[in-house]
Amino acid sequence: MTVLDDIIVGVKEDMEVRRGLVSLAELKERAANAAPARDAWAALGGPSSIRNDLKVIAEIKRRSPSKGDLASIADPASLAVQYADGGASVISVLTEQRRFGGSLADFDAVRAAVETPLLRKDFTVDEYQIWEARAHGADLILLIVAALSDAELADFSALSHELGMNVLVETHTEEEIERAVAAQAKIIGINVRNLKTLDVDRSVFGSLAGLIPAESVIVAESGVRGPEDVSHYAAGGANAILVGEALVSDSTPRERITEFKAAGAAAIAVRN
């Protein structure tokens, strides 16, 4: 069993516990009464003609399968405010509990604190989670190609869009990018971390980014340690980066985001 397979087993078990407490019908009612979703695609650059800087998806993450504990984050709302003040275009909130230490309570706290579009970061394997995300005020959800069939990818994308949310479709290989493009994904992430082994290879981004259509927003995921990595991704075609560890482990995340945005903008200016 791969690391991804093991995570999904736990995700399904935890989801069934929540389903026993809150029915799908109740989630649908809550989703109907939720404030309209914010346009995360526009926040990440939208049409290719207006993408002239690097966007940052700043992540709230207590731990990870590869590194273990990263930060205690007693007040995720306060951290989210710092992210927003630093210029994050989207804030990602982990809600997977077993491996990442996240929760929907974290998400709710962040949602109440900022107007920035929010990514509900979890391993989506059931429509229940999509309704759940919208009911809690999510604007963007994650769909990992490696974890889904083509039918699931299409159906989950369609439901998300029907509910007004955008979708970040995560890939790691050429075949997965082909599947994401076939699903008409508008926001495509390239995760340089292999979720089956947890190995990181930053060169993966450069070898795959050119396969993504220009109209899609390209997000570089994982492997950001500092401005040099940001410049590398931006020079290679990234429109946005998703970064968590480098922010939650830093005492000045607001300034760190500003630094990353400056490095990205400089690289994009050269690229263009």
Curated annotation (Swiss-Prot):
The protein, known as: Indole-3-glycerol phosphate synthase
Source domain of life: Bacteria
Pathway in which this enzyme or protein is active: Amino-acid biosynthesis; L-tryptophan biosynthesis; L-tryptophan from chorismate: step 4/5
Annotated family: Belongs to the TrpC family.
Keywords: Amino-acid biosynthesis, Aromatic amino acid biosynthesis, Decarboxylase, Lyase, Tryptophan biosynthesis
Pfam families: IGPS
GO biological process terms held by the UniProt record: L-tryptophan biosynthetic process
Top EC class for this record: lyase
NCBIfam families recorded: PRK00278.1-1, PRK00278.2-4
Lineage: Bacteria, Bacillati, Actinomycetota, Actinomycetes, Micrococcales
Catalytic reaction(s) noted: 1-(2-carboxyphenylamino)-1-deoxy-D-ribulose 5-phosphate + H(+) = (1S,2R)-1-C-(indol-3-yl)glycerol 3-phosphate + CO2 + H2O
Keyword field contains Protein transport: no
EC id: 4.1.1.48
Source organism: Paenarthrobacter aurescens (strain TC1)
Keyword set includes Lyase: yes
GO molecular function: indole-3-glycerol-phosphate synthase activity; phosphoribosylanthranilate isomerase activity
